[in-house]
Curated annotation (Swiss-Prot):
Family (UniProt): Belongs to the cytochrome P450 family.
EC code: 1.-.-.-
Biological role: Cytochrome P450 monooxygenase; part of the gene cluster that mediates the biosynthesis of alternapyrone derivatives. Alternapyrone is a decaketide with octa-methylation from methionine on every C2 unit except the third unit. All the domains in the polyketide synthase alt5 are apparently involved in alternapyrone synthesis, that is, the 8 CMeT, 7 KR, 7 DH, and 4 ER reactions in the 9 KS-mediated condensation steps required for alternapyrone synthesis.
GO cellular component, one term: membrane
Localization (cell): Membrane
Protein's gene: alt3
Protein name per the record: Cytochrome P450 monooxygenase alt3
InterPro entries listed in its UniProt record: Cyt_P450, Cyt_P450_CS, Cyt_P450_E_grp-I, Cyt_P450_sf, Cytochrome_P450_monoxygenase
Cofactor(s) recorded in Swiss-Prot or TrEMBL: heme
Source organism per UniProt: Alternaria solani
Transmembrane segments: 25-45
């Protein structure tokens, strides 16, 4: 009896002990994460090396506000708003600073040794590699320099002169198609600019046009455009470590579009390499270069040419078209330059159109207000840290210049939200003489800046000159705020831009 009573007492005590342990475990499960978050918040707000930088408190303690704005396609607009409120440097995440100054461009993107390496943890281009292969835009410094040496001859001024026929033929074809189609009503110029840009870069890359202007439903361009908005999901997955899950959950049309793009790139590349009498396209310079590339490197480079080469110029022309139509006095001034300078279509050479001062000013002003990449491509501060704009930033933190905010900043430009090409003309006593034009770098800056800058200017100059020469323009929906309602997904959303085109009757072919 005594033994039984003792055992009951022991079991009762054990039961109480287990209950106490369980309660403590449950309490710990609840309390410890809360305590961790609380300590993290306190650290980010008051103890972090970035604690002294201005910015919204919620963005300083968590990456989630950045993610939310990014997923909604409003990240560039939101960061512009933050710079308007807080100044030229803003803390936009617990471990990231955003800048809008020319000095930040020079330091972050221009410094070579040590280099500020690209942040490929989901803040910018994502994913960094596909199938283990990096692209020109995400490659490590030594490999990137090797690839640049291999392709530099293809983007030289000599190459550009030898490739003029590609630009002339495709811009002429665009004009003819627009003449045929404009009789039926307004045309979506966003689409047409993408089509002609794709034809030009495809012909330059492979010596064979893709036929997009002649066949607007061409599957290749549809495959690329289908991927544009998907990048925010890849950024989120890379940041929070669920790329495997995302790949499993990704809709079939997205994965198929990616596979289709690579397959078509490989097929075009194979045909070009095996061609008997190719013209002077990109590949002719690359294959003749002493810096030899393997097949996979050629495929990835070709993919970069197609995606980046077409998107930059098409976006630049779309933005400029809208801004000119919103500012008819500037459009009229451009008409006077183009129609006064050129007496016939034959006069419109690359050299001639790229020498048009007001046209060039319009292109620069268009890309200031509507930059091809409106956000930021952040870099990591190297080593133990660097001085940026007079303040020490420790190593390992992310920093970058936001293109949209920099171009729209009243600290950099007078009448910053207005379209004034005159600010780029270097006129004496100009009201814009104090503008910090170096704060705008639409093709990025430094050794990783866009290698196709001259090509893009040539393409945009020739195409826009011909459209101004051949047509009068009018917005179909003048009240439609096409620009401000566009989302940004690393690049612009590319909403339709409906324009009424009227052929000019007295042009000389």
């Amino acid at each position: 009896m005594a033994l039984s009573s003792a055992l009951d007492s022991l079991w009762h005590q054990l039961d109480q002990l287990l209950s106490l342990i369980n309660r403590n475990i449950i309490t710990g499960i609840i309390v410890l994460p809360v305590l961790y978050v609380l300590l993290k918040v306190i650290y980010n707000l008051y103890l972090s090396p970035l604690a002294g930088y201005p910015g919204p408190k919620l963005w300083a303690v968590s990456r989630l506000p950045w993610n939310r704005a990014n997923m909604k396609g409003r990240i560039s607009w939101k960061i512009r708003e933050l710079h308007d409120k807080y100044g030229p440097v803003v803390r936009i995440a617990p471990d990231e600073l955003s800048y809008t100054t020319s000095g930040a461009w020079k330091k972050i993107y221009g410094q070579r040794n040590p280099e500020f390496v690209k942040a490929l943890d989901g803040r910018g281009i994502a994913p960094a590699s596909i199938g283990g292969q990096r692209s020109l835009m995400t490659e490590h410094q030594d490999k990137h320099l090797r690839l640049r040496r291999a392709i530099d001859p293809a983007f030289s001024q000599r190459a550009l002169r030898e490739q003029e026929s590609y630009f002339q033929d495709h811009s002429d074809n665009l004009v003819q198609k627009l003449k045929q189609r404009c009789k039926d009503g307004p045309l979506d110029m966003t689409t047409w600019y993408n089509l002609v840009a794709f034809d030009i870069v495809s012909d330059l890359a492979f010596g064979e046009p893709s036929g997009c202007v002649n066949n607007p439903d061409q599957p290749w361009i549809q495959a690329i455009l289908a991927r544009a908005k998907a990048i925010v999901w890849f950024q989120l997955a890379v940041q929070y470590g669920f790329m495997g899950l995302l790949n499993w959950m990704t809709p079939k049309y997205v994965t198929e579009s990616r596979k289709k793009h690579i397959a078509m790139t490989e097929a075009k590349l194979k045909a070009r390499v095996e061609a008997k009498n190719p013209g002077k396209d990109f590949m002719s310079y690359i294959l003749e270069n002493d810096e030899k590339l393997n097949h996979l490197e050629l495929v990835m480079l070709s993919s970069n040419f197609i995606v980046a080469g077409s998107g930059t110029s098409a976006g630049g022309m779309s933005g400029l078209t809208y801004l000119l139509l919103r500012n008819p006095d500037k459009l009229e001034k451009l008409k006077q330059e183009i129609r006064g300078l050129f007496k016939s279509r034959a006069d419109m050479t690359l050299q001639a159109v790229t020498s048009c001062k007001y046209l060039r000013a319009c292109l620069n002003e268009g890309m200031r207000l509507y930059p091809p990449t409106p956000g930021s491509l952040p870099r990591f501060v190297p080593g133990k840290g660097e001085m940026i704009e007079g303040k020490w930033v420790p190593g390992g933190y992310a920093v970058g210049v936001n293109q949209l905010a920099a171009g729209h900043s009243e600290r950099n430009f007078k009448k910053a939200r207005e379209f004034h090409p005159e600010r780029w003309l270097d006129e004496p006593d100009s009201e814009f003489k104090d503008d910090d034009r170096s704060a705008v770098q639409p093709f990025s800056y430094g050794q990783r800046g866009c290698i196709g800058r001259s090509m893009a200017y040539a393409e945009m100059s020739l195409t826009m000159a011909k459209l101004v020469w051949y047509f009068d323009w009018e917005l179909d929906e003048p009240d439609n705020d096409w620009w401000n309602q566009q989302g940004t997904y690393l690049v612009w959303e590319k909403l339709p831009l409906q324009v009424k085109l009227t052929p000019v009757s007295d042009v000389v072919e």
